[in-house]
Amino acid sequence: MKSTQPAKVLTEQRKFLDQFASLPFDDRAADEYGRIRAHLARHGTPIGPNDLLIAAIALANNATLVTHNMAEFNRVPGLTITDWETPA
């Protein structure tokens, strides 16, 4: 659905996203990316390239990844994951 007020939608989106930190894909994340990709390839359990980027950034920053995509991210060794749909 296209908005009739794209400027307003963009402003609201920016307000929402400003509440969160954005972590970069830096050298540490690139190293993690290679390590994870090689490990998963050796075990025949690859994950999608975007999920691989997300996992690498989380590991490089020692961050907990909050997701409902447990099937993919459970394959990544050392990654701390929380399912946002599971009650605490």
Region spans (language model):
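C-terminal structural segments of small proteins and small subunits
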Residues: 60, 64, 68-73
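PIN-domain endoribonuclease scaffold, especially VapC-family toxins
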Residues: 1-56, 80, 85-88
